[in-house]
Amino acid sequence: RVFHLGCLLSDDFSPEVVEYLSTKGRISIDAQGYLREVRGEKVFAIDWADKRKILANTDIIKVNEHEMEVITGLTDPRQAALQLAEWGVKEVCVTLGSEGSIILAEGKFYDIPAYKPKEIVDATGCGDTYSAGYLWCRAQGMGYDESGRFAAAMCTLKLEHTGPFDRTIDDVKRVMK
């Protein structure tokens, strides 16, 4: 069982909730919402006050380049991934846009390529799409590299149209060839 926590704001899931859920299954986090705070009618980027408590109970995290820098203070993706792992995260996925992504798991880095889209229509939801693909593959028992490649291929298909991801597994496999 995997609990994927994709919060909208930094206080959606307390450290206590995450700790409790971690006793019931694996915890996956998309860091984006933890780095936002609403003041009045405006949304502000913030550091994540409870990050160390929550990451200690996190199995998988997905961050992009900006998020990893806010959380760790580091600009190098590999160094940031190592820092997140040091804080307790078992699988660190860092998405790097058109440069692909890296995954750090069990002390090893996996370099995941980005697949070139036919055209870029809309990038909205690509992070969520990556998380969904990666988590689905891992739940099927696939390895880190294959899961990352599948997730990257899903993102390529997502870039090519607006709206939620609505392609098939066969569509994704065609991109991966």
Regions from the language model: what does each represent?
Residues Y20, F44-K53, P77-K177:
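Conserved phosphate-binding/catalytic region of the ribokinase-like
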